[in-house]
């Protein structure tokens, strides 16, 4: 599930009020509706969201004051409570799409209830790993922002702007901290970008482009590896690092026309090359034992806690790279072939791939 965008129409100081950069524009929504009606493979993919949306109509928002997940082991009550509350993001995402597809205001009204409940209770922090878990909430809001009441829009805008501001000034992105160059920073940049484009607030423009270029220059390697892969010795972190970067690239490309997916750093690295590096591991031509040489103590703690996939030597499973390749397929549909090989299914389709099909990509 995650973030796609539309064509740019910039005013002198603000984005066009009708533009939607973190979700689908009106023409794309129309195409989505038509596709869901005519093509069973698309309607089947959306069915799960429809079920969630219908169930959510009778549910009460469950916002949490501060999201606490980063650095906590599975089973920690603080993490458990946060992840339970964050189920709201998936619910509101489903509600927003159900509204756009059906036009039924009951879905919009319930989505608005979730937005405002979170806006009133949740507090912004500068921790990007905690804040990134609100991504679906931001995407959903972008989809329906022009449809909610002015009062609800102001309340939700202020909440999201507070998150973006906290991340812009995040201590984790400063100095010589490892979090200033690893996946933390990739997620920080993504959330700033998605919120900025959702709110049509161009005060973040220079921050987004400057920070992204800096991150690509320090995080990507010419051979297709990333800082995170080398540090953690796990494709789990190659994917967790480049997924937010690709999401940011999609938003920027759709808003400005600049393609950072193929953009070369000073040493010749590109995000595309980092995706391509994973291809033989996705197709099964190569295997990779995960976390064997990780230098991060927390990885060992998670393994000792019995968390799936963190035991040193666990083989990378191609299914865990599918979302990465689905995002990359926005820029190059050739990745769909790799995805289907990885899934051993010539007809495989997921929601991100469907969204790519609904999305108008510039030539």
Q: Model-derived features: where do they sit?
A:
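Extended amphipathic alpha-helical interaction segments
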Residues: 157-169, 179-188, 195-202, 209-218
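Hydrophobic h-region of N-terminal signal peptides that target proteins for export
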Residues: 9-18
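Extracellular glycan-targeting catalytic surfaces
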Residues: 18-178, 186, 254-363
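Positively charged n-region of N-terminal signal peptides that target proteins for export
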Residues: 1-4
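Short gly/pro-enriched beta-turn/loop segments at secondary-structure junctions
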Residues: 187-190, 240
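Amphipathic alpha-helical segments within well-ordered protein domains
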Residues: 95-96, 138, 192-193, 246-250
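Long, repeat-rich segments with strong aromatic
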Residues: 199, 203-289
């Amino acid at each position: 599930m995650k973030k796609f965008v539309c064509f740019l129409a910039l005013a002198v100081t603000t984005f066009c009020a009708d533009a939607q950069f973190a979700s689908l524009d009106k023409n794309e929504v129309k195409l989505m509706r038509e596709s869901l009606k005519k093509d069973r493979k698309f309607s089947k993919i959306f069915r799960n969201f429809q079920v969630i949306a219908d169930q959510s109509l009778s549910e009460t928002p469950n916002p949490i004051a501060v999201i606490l997940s980063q650095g906590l082991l599975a089973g920690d009550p603080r993490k458990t409570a946060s992840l339970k509350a964050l189920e709201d993001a998936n619910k509101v995402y489903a509600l927003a799409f159900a509204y756009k597809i059906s036009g039924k205001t009951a879905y919009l009204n319930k989505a608005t209830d979730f937005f405002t409940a979170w806006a009133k209770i949740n507090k912004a922090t500068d921790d990007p790993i905690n804040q990134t878990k609100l991504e679906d909430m931001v995407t959903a809001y972008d989809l329906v922002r022009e449809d909610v009441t002015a009062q609800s829009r102001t309340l939700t805008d202020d909440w999201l702007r507070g998150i973006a501001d906290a991340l812009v000034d995040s201590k984790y992105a400063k100095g010589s901290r490892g979090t200033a160059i690893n996946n933390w920073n990739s997620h920080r940049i993504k959330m700033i970008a998605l919120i900025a484009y959702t709110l049509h607030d161009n005060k973040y423009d220079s921050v987004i482009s400057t920070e992204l270029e800096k991150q690509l220059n320090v995080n990507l390697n010419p051979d297709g590896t990333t800082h995170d892969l080398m540090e953690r010795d796990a494709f789990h972190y190659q994917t967790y690092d480049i997924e937010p970067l690709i999401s940011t690239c999609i938003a920027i490309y759709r808003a400005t026309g600049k393609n950072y997916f193929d953009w070369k750093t000073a040493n010749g690295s590109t995000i595309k090359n980092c995706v391509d590096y994973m291809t033989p591991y996705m197709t099964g031509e190569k295997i990779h034992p995960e976390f064997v040489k990780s230098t991060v103590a927390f990885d060992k703690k998670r393994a000792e806690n019995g968390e799936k996939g963190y035991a040193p030597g666990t083989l990378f499973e191609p299914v865990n790279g599918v979302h990465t390749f689905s995002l990359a397929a926005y820029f190059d549909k050739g990745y769909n072939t790799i995805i289907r090989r990885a899934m051993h299914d010539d007809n495989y389709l997921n929601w991100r791939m469907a969204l790519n099909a609904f999305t108008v990509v510039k030539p």
